[in-house]
Amino acid sequence: MKLLSLVAVVGCLLVPPAEANKSSEDIRCKCICPPYRNISGHIYNQNVSQKDCNCLHVVEPMPVPGHDVEAYCLLCECRYEERSTTTIKVIIVIYLSVVGALLLYMAFLMLVDPLIRKPDAYTEQLHNEEENEDARSMAAAAASLGGPRANTVLERVEGAQQRWKLQVQEQRKTVFDRHKMLS
């Protein structure tokens, strides 16, 4: 894709900017003449040089008789227009090349995405162990609340943590399920 756009840019630079090679759409004099007396308005296009871009050289055939030509030409607005179709073509080729490259990149990512996001068996096992551990600790906390008093400092801290976790869980249920404020 980069090679194609590079070739297009080099081709554009190597094309000689000669006015003789340009088509009538590239260089033109456009005269817009409004309605005049019983003559309807009209748009005239002519391939003439910039110095000849006026009503007398562009408007052919002249729709008014000889003595009204000057008054008619004063109403007409003539503009010289020049564009480079080669540059337009090069820009379109570059644009299409970029869009094509992005589409290819998107297709590549769609093909590679399942390989990248493949679930890792080890992380799934760790996640399942954490869930099981949480469930066991909740059950142990519920049992320890009603059971005999803990003897060691470590067991007391664990018991306090379990009570705190149960309290937080209860508050979550109250707030999210029952939509009540914290007490």
Curated annotation (Swiss-Prot):
What residues form the membrane-spanning segments? Answer: 90-110
**What is this entry's stated membrane topology?**
Single-pass type I membrane protein
List the ranges whose topology is Extracellular. 21-89
A single cellular component GO annotation: mitotic spindle
Tissues/organs with expression: Highly expressed in adrenal gland, thyroid gland, testis, ovary and prostate. Moderate expression in trachea, spinal cord, stomach, colon, small intestine and spleen. Low expression in bone marrow, lymph node, thymus and peripheral blood lymphocytes. Expression is detected in hematopoietic cell lines including those of myeloid, erythroid, B- and T-cell origin.
Q: How is it modified after translation?
A: N-glycosylated.
- From the Swiss-Prot or TrEMBL record, give the protein name: Proton-transporting V-type ATPase complex assembly regulator TMEM9
Question: Could you tell me the gene encoding this protein?
Answer: TMEM9
